Design a protein with these regions (language model features):
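Active-site gating/metal-coordination segments in enzymes
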Residues: 57-165
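Divalent metal-dependent hydrolysis catalytic cores, especially in the metallo-beta-lactamase
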Residues: 14-15, 28-56, 78-85, 127-128, ...
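Mid-to-C-terminal alpha-helical segments outside catalytic/metal-binding sites
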Residues: 1-12, 24-42, 236-241, 250-298
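Histidine-centered catalytic micro-motifs
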Residues: 9-19, 166-170
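Acidic-and-aromatic substrate-binding clefts and catalytic sites of carbohydrate-active enzymes
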Residues: 18-26, 50-62, 86-93, 105-111, ...
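A general structural detector for well-ordered alpha-helical segments in enzyme core domains, enriched
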Residues: 29-33, 63-70, 113-120, 144-151, ...
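Catalytic pocket-lining loop regions of alpha/beta-barrel enzymes
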Residues: 126-128, 135-243, 292, 296-297
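Conserved, mostly hydrophobic/aromatic
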Residues: 13, 34, 67, 71, ...
Length: 298
């Protein structure tokens, strides 16, 4: 625990569950992971490979239901983020044959993505979304994503709490360039976006001018190993725009601290990046218990 710091440590990036690439059984290993790494509060979401809406019978360690289960198990320390497939929506209009193009298409009308948006936040109690455009194969500024974000804005108002959207933003495909992320985030100023990896490695040269003017987007230093990638953004927009996570269990918490220590020189700034900034933005109430440990009260 970071009992000697002014702010709790809030790690923004941890994959939990079981898939072909991961065996992080959160029920058993999450709290030891956090305690060993000095993490007070942890944002968790599904492993990218195998992510789905509803937890299936064959694997109880994937799905948004699993993330909600972990959040319920550790409510004082964990917030969960949902994964939603933007392609599970009806087309709305014909694209083919040519003579019907643009006309209403009503053969498929159920919208599973929008349904899951409501279920994940209002029923399961999750705190937002994790989006991986590259891994899951969608342009982050596609109209299918925009429809989810439009609905999420409404759901946020219904839930009466600030939600967060963690976006894989390494600029490692045309689906998640700085420019594409800027294009969609500027249209949803009510939503809080965390730009995971802060454009490292391919987007570092345009990070500050594209994302910097958008106050609803935070630079998330998760596995951003090159200080020069974020140097201009730090100089122009200040420490208040930065947060960080571990990218566990694929990276270690020590990597996170090395990045933060190498970028921010004062203890006050490091404390803001490690937890203060995201807690202020989300507005989640927290307290310090008699034993010195921090606890969420949301």
């Amino acid at each position: 625990m970071a009992a000697d710091t002014p702010w709790p440590v809030f790690d923004t990036h941890l994959h939990v569950g079981v898939s072909t690439t991961c065996t992080f059984v959160a029920e058993e290993v999450l709290i030891p992971w956090m305690d060993d790494g000095g993490v007070d509060f942890q944002a968790v979401f599904q492993v990218n490979q195998g992510a789905c809406h509803r937890t299936p019978d064959w694997n109880p360690y994937i799905g948004n239901d699993y993330i909600a289960k972990i959040q319920r198990m550790f409510p004082e320390r964990v917030i969960g983020l949902a994964t939603i497939n933007p392609w599970q929506q009806p087309p709305g209009k014909y694209s083919y044959p040519p003579d019907l193009r643009g006309k209403p298409f009503d053969r498929v009308t159920r919208n599973l993505a929008i349904e899951e948006c409501h279920r994940a936040i209002l029923e399961l109690g999750l705190w937002g979304l994790k989006m991986h455009p590259k891994e899951h194969g969608y342009p982050v500024n596609h109209r299918a994503v925009r429809s989810i974000l439009t609905e999420l804005t409404k759901v946020q108002a219904q839930a009466k709490r600030r939600l967060m959207i963690v976006v894989h933003a390494a600029a490692d495909s045309t689906y998640n360039t700085n420019e594409a992320i800027m294009d969609v985030c500027r249209d949803f100023p009510e939503l809080l976006f965390l730009m995971a990896h802060s454009g490292y490695i391919w987007g570092g040269k345009t990070l500050a001018p594209t994302i910097g003017p958008l106050d609803n987007v935070l630079f998330d230093l998760t596995c951003c190993a090159e200080t020069q990638t974020v140097a201009e953004a730090y100089e122009r927009y200040g420490v208040e725009r930065f947060v960080t996570g571990s990218d566990g269990p694929f990276a270690t918490i020590e990597v996170k601290h090395a990045i933060v220590n190498g970028t921010f020189k004062s203890a006050e700034e490091r404390s803001l990046v490690l937890g203060g900034n995201i807690l202020k933005r989300l507005g989640i109430p927290w307290t310090r218990k008699a034993d010195g440990r921090f606890a969420l009260q949301g």
